[in-house]
């Protein structure tokens, strides 16, 4: 389900108590909203500020070497962030700000993730490919594949 289509609710007093016991803190607990299936069980050592929305954590991630990690948020600061269902966010040295993190995302051992103001995340930007001198620009868009970029760069002047 898309994060924008989820139904959110305020945290209950019991959930806030559990989060506090798990060393979580918020500048304003009333700004934190969670999905109906949310459980605070997998949220530890997290600081919240601004408007934060959190999905449910039901899934485990299988990592190299046979390690399994349950989705959840641990050791992070979130500001104006929406976290989709079944994400694993761990060990964020500084913070994540002004982001919508899609479902099943895995973010670990990062310094800072933020966006300020309006951002296209590269959509519509032309980049030079195959030659540092230019002339083979490809416009980036969110569904661009390597195969499409190849055709755009090498066959751009052929009408068919």
For each feature predicted by the language model, list its residue ranges.
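Terminal amphipathic alpha-helical/low-complexity segments used for targeting or macromolecular assembly
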Residues: 1-160
């Amino acid at each position: 389900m898309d994060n924008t289509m989820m139904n959110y609710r305020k945290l209950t007093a019991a959930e806030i108590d559990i989060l506090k016991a798990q060393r979580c803190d918020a500048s304003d607990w009333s700004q934190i909203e969670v999905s109906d299936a949310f459980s605070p069980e997998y949220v530890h050592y997290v600081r919240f500020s601004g408007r934060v929305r959190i999905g449910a954590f039901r899934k485990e991630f299988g990592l190299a070497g046979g390690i399994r990690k349950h989705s959840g948020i641990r050791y992070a600061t979130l500001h104006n962030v929406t976290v989709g269902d079944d994400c694993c966010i761990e060990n964020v040295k500084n913070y994540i700000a002004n982001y919508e993190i899609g479902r099943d995302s895995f973010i670990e051992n990062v310094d800072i993730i933020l966006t300020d103001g309006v951002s296209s995340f590269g959509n519509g930007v032309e980049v030079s490919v195959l030659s540092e001198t230019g002339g083979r620009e490809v416009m980036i868009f969110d569904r661009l594949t390597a195969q499409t970029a190849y055709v755009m760069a090498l066959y751009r002047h052929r009408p068919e």
